[in-house]
Amino acid sequence: MFNDQCSMKIIYYSSPFYADCDFPLIGELQRKGHDVRYYISIASFSKRSTLIDIKELYPHTGIYPATKIYQEFNEFRNFLDLSQVYVVNQKYKQKFHPVNLLLMVRLVIHFLMQKPDVIHLTKAPCLTQKLFYLARKKLVLTVHDPFLHSGATNKMTERDRRMAFKKIPKQVLLNNRQSSAFASYYHVPDNHIFINKLGMYSSILYVDPLPFQSDRPFILFFGQIVEYKGVEYLLEAMKRVHSRYPELMLVIAGGGKYYFDIEPYKKLDYVKIINRYIGTGELAGMLRACEFGVCPYKDATQSGVIQTAFTLGVPMVVTNVGALAVAVQHNITGLVVNPCDVNDLANGIMELYSNKEKLNAMRTHIKEEWKKDMGWESIADSYLKCYENP
């Protein structure tokens, strides 16, 4: 299974949505001497996402060396071998467009002709991507969401997921809390499931933070606005917080369409809504300036938001859904409150804001203890064991 000198040839195919956890993993695998070729799919709807901030889409469909068409990738040259990074560029955003269907056929052939040891995917194949199943023994799938989020379900996506879980022999879950329920619900044999974790989102440390101007202390929600994230509960909780701590602001930063009437909240002088893509430098500035972060999710798996915040030493108030209560240790690195409970969320925010000694102790614990456990070397080793497993 190995190439010369026990080096593996790994093709890693992903999307910008996972760049903040893909980049450090791929960099670590490359540093270990493996031939890792990273392919990232970019379209109009994904060109500004997590670490990727591409202002203008290259106007042709095809497979290209990343730096040939997007100079923005040069920002990551210090921790990725950019000569091994390629863009799967989609001029047309419709996945059923004939040009995109043909591109996926070309991509599968392109991968197979390289004769890799492993083809690592981060999303279940759909449409003509299902040709990947011709090489099913080489496939590894990272299952970022063992269960689909509320509001994100559709029959085609679920059908594609079920096919992937049936056909792909190695499936990596990023927390242990949901593995039994996942295996039972999707009828996945235990020996097909490998447990790993997210590490420190170290890429944000390489970016110069843009100072965030605020004349009041503030707490921060950041990320894409989608229904499962429970922003409406946070806004209602903030009304109660404001009655006791009128100086405290809430900043909600992220693109996406609001799924409830946001207009009444825009009128509140203690709520600042920034409804657009937030670049990494801008986010770093917000995180360095905030009191702490909040994840009021209604349901979840694990969350890259927590990894990003902790990388910069920022404690979190989170709800007890998915594996968030595993990622955040209650009273140690943050607080865990009940989901969809305005009172409990408000009480958690007020408790942490009012206790500066506790908040500072959490910051210290994150910097001195959490980071010890979140290096990518051991995570990369776990992936290699998965790849090598017969």
Where are these regions (language model features)?
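Acidic anion/phosphate-binding donor-loop and adjacent secondary structure
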Residues: 34, 152-153, 183-184, 191-216, ...
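A short, active-site helix/loop in glycosyltransferases that binds the activated sugar's phosphate group
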Residues: 168-193
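Conserved donor-binding/catalytic core segment of Leloir-type glycosyltransferases
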Residues: 212-229, 235-238
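Nucleotide-activated donor-binding/catalytic signature segment of Leloir-type glycosyltransferases, i.e.
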Residues: 261-284
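Acidic donor-binding loop of glycosyltransferase active sites
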Residues: 285-302, 314
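Short acidic/histidine- and often glycine-rich active-site loop of Leloir-type glycosyltransferases
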Residues: 308, 321-331, 335-336
